[in-house]
């Protein structure tokens, strides 16, 4: 069952394009890119999610990431 997002594909793709341009500008390796993305996710969770819910949200995020990977 596909997941429906409240954000348009165009909006998401626009942000991804801008972020990719910044990473390219800094010649970020895949390892550095993943480190930056992980730090962003951690900061978003820590700054916007109640402490009691952080682990649950992080686990759901991790599950969504694994589900999105191509086999």
Curated annotation (Swiss-Prot):
Name under which the protein is recorded: UPF0352 protein VC_2040
Disulfide pattern: none
Organism for this UniProt entry: Vibrio cholerae serotype O1 (strain ATCC 39315 / El Tor Inaba N16961)
UniProt record similarity statement: Belongs to the UPF0352 family.
InterPro entries documented for this protein: UPF0352 (IPR009857), YejL_sf (IPR023202)
Short name of one Pfam family: DUF1414
